[in-house]
Amino acid sequence: MTTRQPLYKSLYFQVIVAIAIGILLGHFYPQTGVALKPLGDGFIKLIKMVIAPIIFCTVVSGIAGMQNMKSVGKTGGYALLYFEIVSTIALLIGLVVVNVVQPGNGMHIDVSTLDASKVAAYVTAGKDQSIVGFILNVIPNTIVGAFANGDILQVLMFSVIFGFALHRLGAYGKPVLDFIDRFAHVMFNIINMIMKLAPIGALGAMAFTIGAYGVGSLVQLGQLMICFYITCVLFVLVVLGAICRAHGFSVLKLIRYIREELLIVLGTSSSESALPRMLIKMERLGAKKSVVGLVIPTGYSFNLDGTSIYLTMAAVFIAQATDTHMDITHQITLLLVLLLSSKGAAGVTGSGFIVLAATLSAVGHLPVAGLALILGIDRFMSEARALTNLVGNAVATVVVAKWVKELDEDQLQAELASGGRAISDTREEDDLGVAEGPTPTTVK
């Protein structure tokens, strides 16, 4: 029987306290808060440092260790089908809510008075986005370049190819597979070490946000923010909740299970900061490694539900605020463009804003300068985006695993009922399966 550790040693508690201290520091000592920005940036860079090798190890060991290669294509197909359906629902919900509530109505903003220079960089980055360019960008110029740049989709593509090739070698490739599995244990131990710095990273990021923009900016354009936050909550509880119930588990229990990851995301405003831990948590929840390794990384580009809600709401809000008329044809066009452009968003802070700029440029009917209206509050809405994205990808992993019959449902229910062991609460060797040996297909 294990003794429960003191509350103050829990990462969950430490991150909550750090966020609270960050808010107070940013409010009462704004210059100090702004100066703490490197703490948040440094933490996210540490996480990004190990994301590429972790994805590589997880995907390769999962695919190479599978008996039936057809199941890989089946898993990928089901995952993309799920992503497309649910993200489309998210886009539609955002569109309906912003039309009903009309948060920008009555602002009567003159576009010519807006400072477009503030959003010029986002517009330039947005114009670089194209469907063909996005597809070609998935193919890395070099293997080293994919890992050096930390491009998740490029690393994922190479990992899938490498996993297939290693599987074809059979027993001859076993030493390589064993090495990759042991290397993965080292990477996850590094993650455990980095996560001890999560409270410091969350404190720095939150102190900077409040110090730079002020609590007052939380009130400015508050109707849009409140509308967006409520929509995200309803999406998680109603839409994702219904999906979870239909597949035999509770979304509230799942949220409780990933509470530490949600707090890390809340502090850093980046769902990417929780990616390595999500790989561990979802596998521990009963999903096979091969499913987790494909669904989670792919979902960070194709299943961003919170970002989808934000994109439709922000685009129509700009139209309402600038008195730009949007009839049903314009809104359908916007929706169709977003069905494509939203798939290019990554799970990092600010990517949603770049995709919004790309969308406004592509649609043409909406004033791109209107981006300046929401630039100040975009940082505060990124928390809701990132949290919704994370929950959406957790649900997707369980659902797809169940669809392809790669889910241990007894383990799922047991883990959800217990609330899940905190990764930082147990021995690292036990968490990462070191005691189990190098077998890549073992589900912990």
Swiss-Prot record:
The chain crosses the membrane at residues 7-29, 44-66, 79-101, 143-165, 186-208, 221-243, 291-313, 353-375. It is found in: Cell inner membrane. It holds the Pfam family SDF. The keyword Cell membrane applies. GO terms for molecular function: fumarate transmembrane transporter activity; malate:proton symporter activity; succinate transmembrane transporter activity. This is C4-dicarboxylate transport protein. Its main location: membrane. PROSITE patterns: NA_DICARBOXYL_SYMP_1, NA_DICARBOXYL_SYMP_2. SUPFAM superfamilies: Proton glutamate symport protein. Belongs to the dicarboxylate/amino acid:cation symporter (DAACS) (TC 2.A.23) family. It is a multi-pass membrane protein. GO terms for biological process: L-aspartate transmembrane transport. The lineage of its organism: Bacteria, Pseudomonadati, Pseudomonadota, Gammaproteobacteria, Pseudomonadales. Responsible for the transport of dicarboxylates such as succinate, fumarate, and malate from the periplasm across the inner membrane. InterPro entries: C4_dicarb_transport, Na-dicarboxylate_symporter, Na-dicarboxylate_symporter_CS, Na:dicarbo_symporter_sf. Residues 418-444 are annotated as: Disordered. Coiled coil: none annotated. One of its GO terms (cellular component) is plasma membrane. It comes from Pseudomonas chlororaphis (Pseudomonas aureofaciens). Keywords: Cell inner membrane, Cell membrane, Membrane, Symport, Transmembrane, Transmembrane helix, Transport.
